[in-house]
Amino acid sequence: MEPTILLLLALLVGFLLLLVRGHPKSRGNFPPGPRPLPLLGNLLQLDRGGLLNSFMQLREKYGDVFTVHLGPRPVVMLCGTDTIKEALVGQAEDFSGRGTIAVIEPIFKEYGVIFANGERWKALRRFSLATMRDFGMGKRSVEERIQEEAQCLVEELRKSQGAPLDPTFLFQCITANIICSIVFGERFDYTDRQFLRLLELFYRTFSLLSSFSSQVFEFFSGFLKYFPGAHRQISKNLQEILDYIGHIVEKHRATLDPSAPRDFIDTYLLRMEKEKSNHHTEFHHENLMISLLSLFFAGTETSSTTLRYGFLLMLKYPHVAEKVQKEIDQVIGSHRLPTLDDRSKMPYTDAVIHEIQRFSDLVPIGVPHRVTKDTMFRGYLLPKNTEVYPILSSALHDPQYFDHPDSFNPEHFLDANGALKKSEAFMPFSTGKRICLGEGIARNELFLFFTTILQNFSVSSHLAPKDIDLTPKESGIGKIPPTYQICFSAR
């Protein structure tokens, strides 16, 4: 008999056995949710619009805490600002584990600073925060690196002479170069072939991660991993990036000066050498490689995509861009570079950047957590290792905190006196112990890049503002803005 037929028969028999025996009751007292089918879980409740739409519909029926079965595994959803804060901040240690994203699990395997757990995660996070802080405050601060990159961008945009262009590539270049300078110790020219290949791989991978097929993969990863699909291309892309990172690491090994570490890699290699006699150390090659991949990927695509959304919104709402430019002219003028010290004197611009991050809602579902022990939460018992999804979109669009949550309105972050107003619901970087470790760098990038561009250029489109579409191209793990053309005209 053909192997394919045998496989199908085995699957059919297994499915029938599950139907006969029924779905086994999970240990613990889970929050309510739709009744799962054997093997399928809640697939039939999945909206074609994606997981986020599905979860929001289920929230209306089951409340702010509910359970969804992604295939056979139960996952608890947390919705609303107060619920997310109560879990990730109020019970921070209990909810500090990292869950699994099945489509990238074959590459990350719980290594690296983002997807590690337990003592491994704590050691890598402490090291990463300290190292990035040291290289951000050393001879060349992060501020200086961003200012330098912003001026490179200005020169590139001047070359366009106001002709329409897609900003995706240039925004990728500038954000990637900041993380490259901290992690690799160098920036790349915008024409460097290897650099261009890396940016292409990051862009394609982020798009695939946000696709509907990747969302379906979360339900049936144990089965679908044996078949062709987006998951295989994602693994192939990430492996190619790892191969390049491996080459960079070997170059660092060959030129390492213990008395003068140049960057994150050098500092990690020195720590590896220091702990080589410790058989239980977490500072080994695998954690280095996956940490570098994590930092590079998170530090490039998220900030560049936020900038893309930001300038699309400036085309849609030109009066906002004009008001930002007025504040830039008053505070900075046209003859010096914007600095981070300017931010406190520019509440409207700061509010606009906050609103761009809130409205663009870049990682709507949030990177999954898991509970580190049996945990009581709002009367429910979540067994150790239960996966938890903080639906960040439900906080960023929380009507209890934002008057018009589905509209772009910088007034959400301004008080009656025009000063910047903080909001508990503002969590684009998540919150709690797993908050994005690059938050500070990302905030600095957004402010300096945004103000430098609008200091030097006015932006326009061949489309009327009313015709500009803000609908995301993909909306899964990440929201991908639609492609668009923009004109940068020198002021």
Swiss-Prot record:
InterPro entries: Cyt_P450, Cyt_P450_CS, Cyt_P450_E_grp-I, Cyt_P450_E_grp-I_CYP2B-like, Cyt_P450_sf, Cytochrome_P450_fam2. Keywords: Endoplasmic reticulum, Heme, Iron, Membrane, Metal-binding, Microsome, Mitochondrion, Mitochondrion inner membrane, Monooxygenase, Oxidoreductase, Phosphoprotein. Its main location: endoplasmic reticulum. The modification Phosphoserine is found at residue 128. It is a peripheral membrane protein. It catalyses: an organic molecule + reduced [NADPH--hemoprotein reductase] + O2 = an alcohol + oxidized [NADPH--hemoprotein reductase] + H2O + H(+). GO terms for molecular function: arachidonate epoxygenase activity; heme binding; Hsp70 protein binding; Hsp90 protein binding; iron ion binding; oxidoreductase activity, acting on paired donors, with incorporation or reduction of molecular oxygen, reduced flavin or flavoprotein as one donor, and incorporation of one atom of oxygen; steroid hydroxylase activity. Its cofactor is heme. Phosphorylation is accompanied by a decrease in enzyme activity. Induction: By phenobarbital. GO terms for biological process: epoxygenase P450 pathway; response to calcium ion; response to insulin; response to metal ion; response to sulfur dioxide; response to xenobiotic stimulus; xenobiotic metabolic process. Its EC number is 1.14.14.1. Belongs to the cytochrome P450 family. Interacts with chaperones HSP70 and HSP90; this interaction is required for initial targeting to mitochondria. This is Cytochrome P450 2B1. It comes from Rattus norvegicus (Rat).
